Amino acid sequence: MALAGALALGCSLTWAQAPNYAIDPTHTFVNYENGHYGTTTNRGRFSTKDGTLYFDREKKEGKVEIVMDISSVNTGVDFLNRQLQGKDFFNVADYSTGKFVSDKFVFDGDKVSEVHGQLTLLGKTHPVVLKAQKFNCYINPIFKGEVCGGDFETTIMRSQWGVMWGLQFGFEDAVKLIIQIEAIKMK
């Protein structure tokens, strides 16, 4: 339940290549799923604040930095949202953003298959590997320019980031992250 925020992403890397895409925050979200009591799955979503992408399909290179707004956590239940924002979970008073920074895209032929990076949440940074479910670039008729985007998944252990609440009485440590990302080519 808690570590969906995991994909909080930030802009701090020094890149040899300049970012050539800007993250579209209206199409970029981190969703999470966390089981509890062996019954149902809790789900929620975090919005993104900012981010950049460098992508070169010909060179088979990619880098991404995304900043996530942890205070935007939305489960559809106001009480649970407030609980997740508190000190027992995401402590948004001290850690209002999270970030994901990657400097390695893995390709299978011409397709992006994985994105390796570092996830920072609650001031702790750990490596994660995002598996591409799909990724593509196309000419967007609204923006009249190229947009690249895709869906990625990974499973993390929230205890690595210090989110321990509920582990002793039925909330699972494993959190599945489902990341939707779109980025618009800069002119």
Which ranges hold each PLM region?
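Bacterial N-terminal signal peptides
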Residues: A2-S12
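Low-complexity, acidic/polar, glycine-enriched regions of mature
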Residues: W15-K187
